[in-house]
A protein has these predicted regions:
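Short beta->alpha connector loops
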Residues: 18-23, 43-44, 90-93, 310-311, ...
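Short beta->alpha junction loops
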Residues: 16-17, 59-72, 307-310, 361-362
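A broadly used, surface-exposed interaction patch
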Residues: 34-108, 112
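Structural motif
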Residues: 12-13, 36, 83-85, 300-302
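Intrinsically disordered, low-complexity Ser/Thr/Pro/Gly-rich regulatory segments
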Residues: 23, 142-379
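A short acidic, amphipathic alpha-helical/loop segment
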Residues: 24-31, 51-52, 74-75, 98-102, ...
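Mixed-charge intrinsically disordered linker/loop segments at interdomain junctions
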Residues: 97-99, 104-170
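N-terminal beta-strand-loop-alpha-helix module at the start
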Residues: 3-52
Length: 379
């Protein structure tokens, strides 16, 4: 068989019963390396076909045929190939019954992907064989596009190593004294618009004396911090660094992002991802979502919502909805919180929705990536 394949003497064709779960339309083609892929779709699936990600990743020629239960058998007879594999993931019970009968009669191969078992199954002549599942490694953008969304290109500031230290300093100070930090950040945020546009921030000397213990612990945030010309003067290293102070959620998002990146376990990791729900061009009125941290691994989307303070059950529902929308049934919804809520009902709700909840104790120990990987083994 292998020698014949090398000399192209056998034509291998994959027939894919189209599935609303787009990832499943891609896996069999990746697994089998066929010479032709034929997608069979129903009338109500027309809006799903010709997915750009699928067509870019499948190297074999592709064809599309619309079917109904009445026409399915005759369509199968028209398909060419010495070895015909039929992926039954997308068919309803009637379609699978028709395909199974045709497979027995014509000695077709029936195949399907076992995502939970990490196996690819092939049924032929009454026997079942298994292969290790080959799932294409996709970027965050590819997975989002696969499920109909589009990532918006935003001018995001990815801090360098110096900026990372600044973010870590801000988060550490907030963790030491959240109330003091809140008052400090509020004072910075209340500055006039002219100060917000510059790196230099000035206030009465009282501000410096009130918050000197915080300021001295932020050496990477400020290039200068002290009394000058009778006033308190703070010189931010960069305008973007002001956000690290005024919005504590930002340093916590970066902390989560860096934990994921540092693990080197994921195919792709991105930060503060803005997504157009319908794959459009972000025109006014288009539904969109911002995901705090997003990663991908073996074709699965990990959607992480970051909460630096208290959260409610709505936050759990929201991260679940976003993960399902942009990553399908294999997505991994995660809520990372820099607080231990000690609310058993929240834990129960997260478990009910299959949302991984990672709170302050684990985040401070930098266990986010480890816990996500362990979760993915059983979910």
């Amino acid at each position: 068989m292998t020698a014949l394949r090398e000399y192209n003497l056998i034509m291998r064709t994959l027939v894919e019963l189209y599935d609303a779960e787009q990832m499943l339309n891609l896996i069999a083609a990746t697994q089998l390396e066929c010479d032709l892929v034929v997608f069979l779709y129903t009338a109500d699936q027309k809006h799903l076909i010709h997915n750009e990600v699928i067509e870019n990743l499948i190297t074999a020629p592709t064809e599309y045929m619309e079917y109904s239960p009445a026409s399915l058998e005759s369509l199968l007879d028209q398909i060419e190939g010495d070895e015909i594999f039929i992926d039954v993931h997308g068919g309803d019970d009637l379609a699978i019954s028709i395909v199974s009968a045709a497979a027995e009669r014509n000695r077709y191969y029936i195949c399907y992907s076992g995502m939970s078992t990490d196996q690819f199954y092939i049924l032929h002549d009454g026997t079942t064989s298994m292969q290790k599942l080959k799932v294409p490694r996709l970027s965050v953008r590819q997975i989002v596009a696969l499920y109909g969304g589009k990532v918006r290109n935003l001018p995001e500031s990815y801090f360098d190593d110096y900026g990372r230290k600044a973010a870590e300093e801000c988060l550490a100070e907030h963790r030491r004294s959240a109330k003091r930090w809140t008052a400090f950040a509020k004072a910075i945020a209340s500055a006039g618009s002219s100060q917000k546009e510059n790196t230099v921030w000035r206030a009465d000397t009282k501000f410096y004396h009130d918050y000197e213990n915080i300021l001295e612990n932020l050496p990477h945030v400020f290039d200068f911090c002290g009394i000058r010309d009778g006033r308190c003067e703070l010189v931010f290293h960069d305008r973007a660094y002001q956000l690290l102070v005024t919005d504590i959620g930002v340093p916590f998002e970066y902390e989560t992002y860096y934990q994921m990146v540092d693990s080197k376990a994921f195919d792709d990791v991105d930060l503060r991802v803005n997504i157009d729900w319908n794959g459009g061009d972000f025109v006014s009125g288009d539904p969109n979502s911002e995901l705090d941290v997003v990663a991908s691994l073996k074709g699965r989307l990990i959607s992480i919502s970051c909460k630096a303070g208290k959260y409610d059950q709505q936050a759990i529902y929201e991260v679940k909805a976003n993960a399902d929308k942009f990553g399908g049934i294999t997505s991994v919804p995660v809520l990372c919180a820099d607080i231990d809520m000690e609310r058993p009902e929240y834990v129960e709700k997260a478990n009910e929705l299959n949302v991984l909840l990672i709170e302050h104790k684990e985040m401070k120990k930098k266990k986010a990536a480890q816990m996500i990987l362990k979760w993915m083994e059983t979910h």
